[in-house]
Amino acid sequence: MLKKSLAALALGTALLSAGQAMAADYVIDKEGQHAFVDFKISHLGYSFIHGTFKDWDGTFSFDAAKPEASKINVELKTASLFTNHAERDKHISSKDFLDVAKYPEAKFVSTAVKSTGEKTADVTGDLTLHGVTKPIVIKATFNGEGKDPWGGYRAGFNGTSTLNLNDFGIKGPGPTSQTLDLDITFEGVQKK
């Protein structure tokens, strides 16, 4: 009788454990250059300026079986802005726009994840930029996950969002320069 009870308990525990999805924790792989925050903004309505932020990092938790339980936290150094033009970078970093001396960091903290397809989701979160915190939605795509050649385990994503800079107290030189398109791509390495 005791053997049957122990066997039933072991089987029940195994089934319960198998039925519960476990989110894994990841660190965004910026050291391996597998992480990018790129942007595009209109230049006076005539063309587009493309740029990136070189210094940012973050963490996330993810389980492909239960993406709604995912969470992400990202911090970005605003002074790491790069548009391949030193004078323009200096101007965008000045008090006229980002004011990186006063606001050296931008931060995103997710508050909800809603699946929109087999590998897509809307990630809602609070973005703090230029001293203002506002909710935004990132349209995210899960690119895949698996073992890497160095003994780790990775998961990769990309996402897009559009920001109205006026919402964050940043004034552009005209109405066409108020909308900034974000394109985010990253791999995370699972914490051991």
Curated annotation (Swiss-Prot):
Primary location: periplasm
Organism whose genome encodes this protein: Pseudomonas syringae pv. tomato (strain ATCC BAA-871 / DC3000)
InterPro entries: Lipid/polyisoprenoid-bd_YceI, TTHA0802/YceI-like_sf, UPF0312/YceI
A UniProt-annotated Pfam family: YceI
Signal sequence range: 1-23
Subcellular location: Periplasm
Domain of life assignment: Bacteria
Keyword Disulfide bond tagged: no
NCBIfam families linked to this entry: PRK03757.1 (NF002994)
Gene Ontology CC entries for this record: periplasmic space
Record protein name field: UPF0312 protein PSPTO_5071
Gene3D superfamilies given in the database record: Lipid/polyisoprenoid-binding, YceI-like
Family, as annotated: Belongs to the UPF0312 family. Type 1 subfamily.
Keyword terms, alphabetized: Periplasm, Signal
